[in-house]
Amino acid sequence: MPKKSKDGSGKIKRNYPDAFIENAGIVVQEKITDTLEKNYMPYAMSVIVSRALPEIDGFKPSHRKLLYTMYKQGLLTGKRTKSANVVGETMKLNPHGDDAIYETMVRLSRGNETLLHPYVDSKGNFGKSYSRDMAYAASRYTEVKLDPICNELFRDIDKDTVDFVPNYDNSTTEPTLFPTTFPTILVNANMGIAVSMASSVCPFNLAEVCETCIAYIKNPDHDIISTLKGPDFPGGGFMLYDEEEIKEIFRTGRGSIKLRSKYNYDKSANCIEITQIPYSTTIEAIIEKIIDLIKQGKIKEISYIRDETDLNGLKIAIDLKRGVDPEKLMNKLFKLTPLQDNYSCNFNILIGGVPRVMGIREILGEWVAFREECVKRRVYFDLNKNKPSSS
């Protein structure tokens, strides 16, 4: 920044009087398409490829860097370590800061209940995915190790099954993909927002996914819906099953699924207890919406609502006024509040660095091809290792 002179002249003294500014005062005319191509597209593709969208192994780069760091730390078989230790080591692969790394760890943990099959075995307060107010503790207070399911993520990774690339400062290497032995891309929910596109892959039952994959390998024309009935969300609740909608999602990778909360009616207390809510919402969003409806006069049957969630699990208690039919009230709440919510599916996955929206059959086809390549590379590695050396 230019400094003011101290000689009292009031003139601004330049730090670099001989500096030359290229095109100073000149307006450069350029087609907007060319400008976008040079400036916007590299940024957009960087977000799409390097951050937001999952790949065929079911992971984004941030997930992969964290889990691989934990694997290298021996946390697949060893005892838990402080989360802060893992975060610090992960920064060798991920330079985006400790807060971003720890937040990724929280979402992958068992304690947060975001995933159907968590990858991180956690100890301590990791918050809850269904509550905005239940914040997770700092990394120095929590402990983690890899969940046993991660054995299937790293199996034979040391046998040249996948490619490795240098990290950001060329001090070490990291895998471009994990040689997963089951279609993780379909087992756990994966959401991401990129530039001009997004991804939202719903989770499915692990046993059904494996059964469907085996059937597909034996017969590529296998009827997918006969073995994979529909999504399976963590946290419970009900899915309003629409077979035609499910078939459309399976075929195109796009669609919407209706999820409904589970509740009990305590007759003695004249109280409705919500014990499970849709995966796509939170306790606070539900309570705020109900209170808003009460203020507007659209809901008059409720005398009090409170959050009774504790270590035993989720619970929203709704006290009813005398003479209110709980079933009729719940039907009204399902229509007006997130107690019934939609989960939008958009199976947008990176294949060879290119985003593609695919149906279940296409995803299975891509995963099987990927897995076949991993097996071939492992076999070649073993053959070369056991090959007798020529004397």
Model-based region annotation:
Residues 2-16, 23-31, 191-193, 197-391:
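C-terminal interaction appendages of subunits in large macromolecular complexes
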